[in-house]
Structure formats: structure tokens, C-alpha cells
């Protein structure tokens, strides 16, 4: 089998959907289906079962896909070793980044990185910090940028802290929250963030909010607060250049600002790769030059 065919099987196994896999591979669905049939014929067995719900990997397919994964990873490793011998920054930088950081801070970091190292490639996934940590544990990525205080036995570099604010278009004093009928707009988040907010709230008010609205995305939560629908608690990274809303810092019982730390994590061998070293240096230089939030 050619490496291109192995990569195709890896993508199909990840998506389990012909349309999505075809989009990722930049081919048409009929062409992808025909190539899959050719591969299955060469192996003499079905790799996937097709249904209206998508694809299901067969027992034989599991072994073939594991082989495809192993060969693909080995190919990447050899390419990285060759790139290191040539002394230039090549290879793929694999990142797993918390969504908030990926949306509001990472783009300018990556812009600098790709301008300095145009031959390097980037593979990026974003999501809740707990999901990104799982990708790191499973060795799917080189580097994780995680919020909170994750348990990690490898290298763990502190990057920054952004403080939490209660934002509202009408209320300008946190104590007034106890008397308002306005809804508390919340967004779905990982458990550690939710627990921090719950802990602060019950220490401060000793009772539950009178009304709540729960939305899927932090940006939806922010826009609803900015448009006066209710109040929200948001990290400062999402509030840059937002001057038309009241922003009240959350303080703990000792009067200290409450914030969320952001960390750069990875296994030690990953930091030996030149593309990873270059990325870490870009971040360090950027943090030395400016306050991120």
C-alpha cells in the first residue's frame, strides 16, 4: 500500500463518515469510495461496514487501521529526524489547545511562527482543557496548552494568568447581583472551571441565582451579556477592547483576584524536536514583549 492510501484509512477511521473524510482529504465522495473499494479488494476483506449512520470498523479493519496508524507515525518520526539533520525547522507541530486560548490568543502566536518558519506544518485541535489533556496523555500531540491546574508529570511551563470578571451592561457593583432579577448567563465548560465559579458564588451569595441561561459556547454567552440580556462571568482573555460593558473583578475571601492559569505541557522527548523548540521560543518572546491580556 502507498503512504497516501494509509493516510486515507487513518482519516476514515477518525471521521467514520465518508463526506467528512472526503472533505478532509480534498477528494470527492465517489472517488474516495472507489479508492476504499480498491484497498479492501487488495486486502481481501472489508475494512468498514457502511450504513446510513456512517462507517463501522470491522474486526479485520481494526488491525489494518492500526497498521496504517503505526506506519504513518513512523513516517512522521523519520521525517522529523531527517529535518533535524538538515538543520532547518520542518516537520509538523502538533498542538492541543484549550478553546478560549485557541480563539483569542493563539492566532497571533501562530502568525509569528509561520512567518518565521514557513516550512513547518501545524496540526491543531481545540476543545475543553480536559479533552486536550487526554490527547496529550494519548501521545496524539506534541504540546498541550491547558487552562486550570492540570495533573502532569512531564514538563509543565507556566504561561499566564487571566482574571475572571462579572460583566453586565446595567449592574456596576457585584453586591447588586443578590437583588437582581436579571439572568445569570453561563456557558458549558469543563468541570474545573465550573467548580471555581460555583465555589466563588456560594461563598459570596450563599444562595443560587434567581434565573440562569445555559449556552453551548463562551462567545454566545459573551454576546448575550454585551447585548444586555443578563450578566455573565468571563475570563479577561475574552474581554479585550470591550469597553462598553461594566467589568467587575471576582475576588476571593482575602480580596485577591480570582484567575485561570494557562500552562504549556508536553513529554520531554517532544521538546527535543526543533519545531517544538521554535514554537516555545516564539511564545517566550511574545510573553516577554507584552502582557497577553
UniProtKB/Swiss-Prot annotation:
Q: Does the keyword DNA-binding apply?
A: yes
| Positions of the DNA-binding region | 18-37
UniProt-listed GO biological process terms: regulation of DNA-templated transcription
Keywords attached to this Swiss-Prot or TrEMBL record, sorted alphabetically, are:
DNA-binding, Transcription, Transcription regulation
Q: Where is the HTH lysR-type domain?
A: 1-58
**Family to which this protein belongs:** Belongs to the LysR transcriptional regulatory family.
Name this polypeptide is given = Uncharacterized HTH-type transcriptional regulator YkuM
Species name for this entry?
Bacillus subtilis (strain 168)
